[in-house]
C-alpha cells in the first residue's frame, strides 16, 4: 500500500482523532437560507441600518431567532453599514461666486476678507487680506486691533495706487465691506462689487483657501507678543508666500513669478484712488505688508 493509499482509519488512529470528528459536516439549519435571503432584502431596503434593526424586523415578520445568531450571520455575509457621507456643497455657484464670476486675467477679480486671532496677552488681532484671484498674489496683509470702513478704504487705496484698479472685488457682506462710504469709493473707481450670499463662504473660495494657508503656516505656529510683532511676521510671511512658496494651482510656481510671466493688462486708474492720495503720499505711506510694484 503506497503513501497515498493510507486508510482513513489508520490516519485517525495515528493522530488520535475520532473518525466521527473527521467525517463531521456542519449542518445548516432548515431556516438559515431563508433568514439570510431575507436579511439581504432588508439590508438593500435599509442600507443605513445595522444588525439590531434587521433582527427586530425579522422578529416582527415571525422569525424565531435570537440577536446573537443574526449578528453571526451578519458577519458571515459581510454586511456593513456604509459611513455617513457629508452632503456636498456647491462650490461658488451663486451669482457672485467663484464659478460664475471667475477671474480671467490679472487685476480682473480681487477678493478680500478678515482673519481673527489673539496675541499672547489675549488681546484681539485682526488681519485684512486682499488677493488677486488670477495670480494668487497676496496684495495686502494688514493686521490691526480692529478695522473701520475708512481703514479698509485706506488700505485698498494704497494697493490700487501701486497695482492699478481691479474690475471686480469679491467679499462677504461684513459691515466693513458694505459701508456706504466704501461702496461710493468703489463705484467712483469703476470697481464692480461681487457680494457673496450670506452664510456661503465657499463662494469666496480663493479667500478661504488663502486663509487656510495663513492659519496653518503662520497663525497656528506663532504666539504673537504684541501687535508690532504680528505686523513684522505678517510682512515676512507674505513675502515668502508671494516670492518663494510654490503654488500648486499655478503649476508649483510662486505667485509673483507667475504674475511676472503674464502680459500686463491695461492699467486702470480710477478717479477715487487718485483723489485720495498723490503718488508722493502713496510712496511715503505704503505699509510694508502691501505688495510692491513688479510682483
Q: Where are the predicted features?
A:
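Charged DNA-binding/catalytic regions of mobile-element recombinases
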Residues: 1-295
Amino acid at each position: 500500500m503506497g503513501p497515498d493509499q493510507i486508510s482513513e482509519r489508520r490516519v485517525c488512529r495515528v493522530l488520535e482523532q475520532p473518525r466521527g470528528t473527521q467525517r463531521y459536516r456542519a449542518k445548516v439549519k432548515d431556516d438559515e437560507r431563508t433568514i439570510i435571503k431575507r436579511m439581504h432584502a432588508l439590508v438593500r431596503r435599509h442600507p443605513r441600518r445595522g444588525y439590531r434593526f434587521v433582527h427586530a424586523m425579522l422578529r416582527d415578520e415571525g422569525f424565531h431567532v435570537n440577536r446573537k445568531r443574526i449578528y453571526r450571520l451578519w458577519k458571515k455575509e459581510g454586511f456593513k453599514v456604509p459611513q455617513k457621507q457629508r452632503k456636498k456643497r456647491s462650490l461658488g455657484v451663486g451669482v457672485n461666486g467663484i464659478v460664475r464670476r471667475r477671474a480671467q486675467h490679472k487685476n480682473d477679480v480681487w477678493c478680500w476678507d478678515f482673519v481673527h486671532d489673539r496675541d499672547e496677552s489675549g488681546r484681539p488681532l485682526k488681519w485684512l487680506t486682499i488677493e488677486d484671484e488670477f495670480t494668487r498674489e497676496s496684495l495686502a496683509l494688514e493686521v490691526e486691533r480692529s478695522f473701520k470702513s475708512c481703514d479698509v478704504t485706506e488700505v485698498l487705496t494704497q494697493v490700487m495706487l501701486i497695482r492699478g484698479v481691479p474690475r471686480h472685488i469679491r467679499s462677504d457682506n461684513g459691515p466693513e465691506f458694505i459701508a456706504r462710504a466704501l461702496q461710493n469709493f468703489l463705484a467712483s473707481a469703476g470697481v464692480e462689487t461681487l457680494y457673496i450670499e450670506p452664510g456661503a463662504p465657499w463662494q469666496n473660495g480663493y479667500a478661504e483657501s488663502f486663509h487656510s494657508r495663513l492659519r496653518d503656516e503662520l497663525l497656528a505656529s506663532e504666539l504673537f507678543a504684541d501687535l508690532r510683532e504680528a505686523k513684522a511676521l505678517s510682512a515676512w510671511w507674505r513675502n515668502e508666500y508671494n516670492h518663494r512658496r510654490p503654488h500648486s494651482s499655478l503649476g508649483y510656481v510662486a505667485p509673483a513669478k507667475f504674475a511676472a510671466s503674464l502680459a500686463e493688462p491695461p492699467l486702470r486708474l480710477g478717479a477715487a484712488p487718485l483723489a485720495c492720495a498723490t503718488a508722493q503720499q502713496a510712496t511715503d505711506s505704503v505699509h510694508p505688508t502691501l505688495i510692491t510694484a513688479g510682483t
